[in-house]
C-alpha cells in the first residue's frame, strides 16, 4: 500500500494504534495487512480478535481474496465456475502462517503468555489486536477504566519491545467525533478512555471515510465515493500526513487508489472448499491457524496461576 511508502514499513518494537468510529473499516484494514504479511511475504502473523470469531474473520479473508460478493459467499449461492475460483484463490490461505486467537475478554497477562508462545514456536513477526478497549488489565486498576486502559496501553508497548515485533492495536474513538461539524475528521484528543494511548503509541493512524457522513466531495472537488483517508496523526519517527486509499466495501479490503478493481470472479470446483473454511474452524474460542491446526496449543491453562507481574 501507499501507506508503506510513508511509514517505511512497520518498525520492530513499534506500537501502532489504528483508530476510527464504527463502520469505517478498522477490521478490514488490519485484516488486509495481516493477509499481505502472511500470504505475500510468508511472515508469521498473530491476530488476537476479541470481538469477531475466527470463523467470521476467515469468511472476510475468503471474500477479500476471491473478490466474490459477500452475500453470495455466505449463502453459498455460487455458480460452479465461481466455486472453482474460490477454491483456487483461497489455496494460499491454507498454508499462510496466520494464527487467529478469538478468546473474548482477554487479559493483558493471558495475551502476553500467548504472544510469547507464538513467538517461540512460530517466530511471529507481527501482532494485531482487535481491539484494545476489549482487553482487561490488572486488579489494581479495576473500577477506573481510564487507568486500566492506560495500563493496557503501556503493557502492550512493553510486550512489543520484549518480543521485538511491531504491534498493531485497534482502538475506539469518542462519540464526540461525530458531534463536531464540518468534515468530522478525527483528532488525537478523540482517542477513547485514555490519553496514555497517544503517549505510548509510536504511530497513531485514523481511518476516515467522508462518504459515510454524506460528504460527497473533498476540499478539491474530487468525489469521495469508495475513498478512505488514512490520517497519520502521530508518527514518532516520521512525518504526519494523510494517505488516500480505495475502500472496497463489498470485498472488505483496502487498495491503493491506482489499483484497478478486481476482475470478475471466475470460480470453485465443489462446495467442499467453502465448507472447510466456513464451518471447519474450531467452534470454541481459542487460537487457530489458517495454515496449521493449533488447537489449544497456545491457550493459557486457567487452572494455573497466571503470571500477572507487570512486564516492565
Place the predicted regions along the sequence by residue.
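Structured core elements
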Residues: 2, 15-19, 29, 46-49, ...
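Short, small/acidic-rich helices and loops at N termini and domain boundaries
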Residues: 24, 43, 67, 142, ...
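Short, ordered loop/turn segments at secondary-structure junctions
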Residues: 50-52, 78, 131-132, 172-173, ...
Amino acid at each position: 500500500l501507499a501507506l508503506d511508502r510513508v511509514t517505511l514499513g512497520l518498525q520492530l518494537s513499534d506500537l501502532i494504534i489504528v483508530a476510527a468510529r464504527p463502520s469505517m473499516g478498522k477490521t478490514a484494514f488490519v485484516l488486509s495487512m495481516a493477509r499481505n504479511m502472511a500470504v505475500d511475504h510468508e511472515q508469521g502473523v498473530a491476530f488476537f480478535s476479541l470481538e469477531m470469531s475466527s470463523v467470521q474473520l476467515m469468511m472476510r479473508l475468503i471474500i477479500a481474496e476471491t473478490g466474490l460478493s459477500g452475500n453470495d459467499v455466505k449463502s453459498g449461492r455460487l455458480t460452479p465456475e465461481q466455486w472453482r475460483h474460490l477454491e483456487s484463490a483461497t489455496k494460499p490461505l491454507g498454508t499462510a502462517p496466520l494464527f487467529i486467537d478469538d478468546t473474548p475478554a482477554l487479559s493483558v497477562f493471558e495475551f502476553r503468555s500467548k504472544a510469547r508462545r507464538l513467538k517461540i514456536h512460530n517466530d511471529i513477526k507481527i501482532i494485531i489486536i482487535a481491539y484494545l478497549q476489549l482487553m482487561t488489565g490488572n486488579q489494581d486498576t479495576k473500577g477506573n477504566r481510564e487507568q486500566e486502559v492506560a495500563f493496557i496501553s503501556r503493557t502492550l508497548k512493553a510486550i512489543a519491545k520484549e518480543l521485538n515485533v511491531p504491534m498493531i492495536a485497534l482502538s475506539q474513538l469518542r462519540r464526540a467525533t461525530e458531534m463536531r461539524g464540518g468534515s468530522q475528521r478525527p483528532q488525537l484528543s478523540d482517542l477513547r478512555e485514555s490519553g496514555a494511548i497517544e503517549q505510548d503509541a509510536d504511530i497513531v493512524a485514523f481511518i476516515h471515510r467522508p462518504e459515510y457522513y454524506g460528504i460527497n466531495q473533498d476540499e478539491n472537488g474530487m468525489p469521495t465515493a469508495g475513498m478512505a483517508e488514512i490520517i497519520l496523526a502521530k508518527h514518532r519517527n516520521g512525518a504526519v500526513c494523510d494517505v488516500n486509499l480505495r475502500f472496497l466495501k463489498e470485498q472488505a479490503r483496502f487498495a491503493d487508489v491506482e489499483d484497478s478493481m478486481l476482475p470478475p470472479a471466475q470460480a470453485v470446483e465443489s462446495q467442499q472448499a467453502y465448507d472447510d473454511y466456513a464451518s471447519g474452524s474450531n467452534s470454541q474460542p481459542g487460537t487457530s491457524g489458517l495454515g496449521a491446526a493449533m488447537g489449544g496449543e497456545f491457550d493459557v491453562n486457567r487452572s494455573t496461576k497466571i503470571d500477572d507481574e507487570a512486564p516492565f
